[in-house]
């Protein structure tokens, strides 16, 4: 395969793999029961992101480009899951929203529901507060969350 095509194919393959990974995480009805389970789940996500990063670095060798971009998204989601202090959730989620401006309320709701330790009031407060703040997109940002559909049933249940 010629270099420009290989470069484009590798970048698209990485985007799709990460997209499907995030889709699986967001759509599964996983709910961690304890801080230990959250920690183990988040560490597994970080390990898998590192494996994907290594694979795509090998595939992208010689292109002179950063091949980590999309894999970092998995690690960022893992950080929200791993967080042990629920009072810091708002800060971590707001960092996620500023990094990934296409992330929607449904994604945040699914992520907080997955944690299993967030009250409905806290979820609603976080989502409402984040809706009020403007998000300034990085001009180089390639949207990934806009392609991830989250079952609306979860969000409706969360906010009631």
Feature map (PLM): residue ranges:
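Extended alpha-helical "rod" scaffolds
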Residues: 1-160
């Amino acid at each position: 395969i010629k270099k420009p095509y290989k470069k484009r194919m590798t970048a698209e393959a990485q985007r799709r793999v990460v997209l499907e990974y995030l889709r699986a995480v967001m759509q599964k009805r996983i709910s961690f029961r304890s801080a230990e389970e959250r920690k183990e789940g988040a560490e597994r996500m970080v390990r898998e992101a590192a494996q994907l990063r290594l694979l795509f670095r090998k595939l992208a060798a010689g292109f002179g480009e950063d091949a980590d971009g999309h894999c970092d998204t998995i690690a960022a989601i893992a950080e929200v899951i791993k967080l042990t202090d629920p009072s810091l959730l708002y800060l971590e989620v707001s960092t996620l929203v500023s990094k990934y401006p296409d992330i929607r309320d449904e994604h945040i709701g699914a992520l907080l529901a997955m944690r299993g330790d967030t009250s409905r009031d806290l979820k609603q407060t976080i989502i409402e507060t984040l809706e009020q703040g403007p998000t300034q997109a990085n001009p180089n940002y390639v949207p990934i969350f806009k392609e991830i559909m989250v079952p609306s049933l979860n969000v409706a249940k969360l906010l009631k």
